[in-house]
Amino acid sequence: MERVRLVDWLKSERDQHVGGGLYYNSQILFAYNSNHMEGSTLSPEQTAQLFNTGAVLPDNINDEIRADDVAETTNHFNAFNWVLDHIDDPVNKSLVCSLHGILKRGTSQEFDANRNVGGYKIVPNVISQLEGIHTVLPADVPL
């Protein structure tokens, strides 16, 4: 039996548009959990809906859906694909900054000079769902 690298399996499922497989579930769970930790209001079902159709509906008629939540979730889908395509590239500053740029493209943060999208942070991060958790200060980020 021939061994298949996980990345090759995921890329194969992606390229063949396999529904319900490892690639499909990884995309949805990765995007939902990462964005939820950052304060996204999209549900797992809405995340799947966005992945499947490119659109999302509110769970309730009075719920609002933030544009940044949609953009960041879509960006996560794109970033996951980008990582699959660059998995063998050396991890360096350029790769990290490119990935950050993909994640924040089209969001309100992209146009905020304090956010330095596509570069290293210049202001401290806040993880809205984890009170009391402190992240590394910008001055302490190794370059």
Positions of the model-derived regions?
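FIC/Doc superfamily catalytic core
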Residues: 1-143
